[in-house]
Amino acid sequence: MEREKVLHTLAKIARDLDRDINRTGARHAAAVVYKNQIISYGVNQRKSHPFHSRFSEHDDAIFLHAETDAIKNALRQISEDELEKATLYVCRVKYDSNGPNKKLTWGNSKPCIGCRRAIANFGIKDVIYSNDGVGNHCLL
């Protein structure tokens, strides 16, 4: 599956997380791709979840991140051995300004320390994440 296609799909999911035009901040979405198919999605959530707390950097950082949500959901579809062969994609969208003409653009979605810990724990070697600017992406 093409990187750009997966990232654009995630950008749409992240954009639609909150339709409130007055909301500031960023939205994250992630996907696990295995054998050229998206097998799971994940999004940032404000509710706590024990799965993320296993990997968080701080004891109070227990909210489910898009990356850990996608990994958690993937484990319902594939084994941990198969997950090692999968690719994790992460996308962030954010507003380019605070004015009346603000638009959503891609942002840096490099996984945090806790998410990188989860990625390493499950042996995921290929991670692709969006970077600031339209269409930019990086490899972890």
Task: Walk through the language-model features, giving the residues of each.
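Zn2+-dependent cytidine deaminase-like catalytic core
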Residues: 41-140
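Short, basic/aromatic recognition patches
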Residues: 1-26
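Short beta-strand scaffold segments in enzyme catalytic cores
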Residues: 25-41
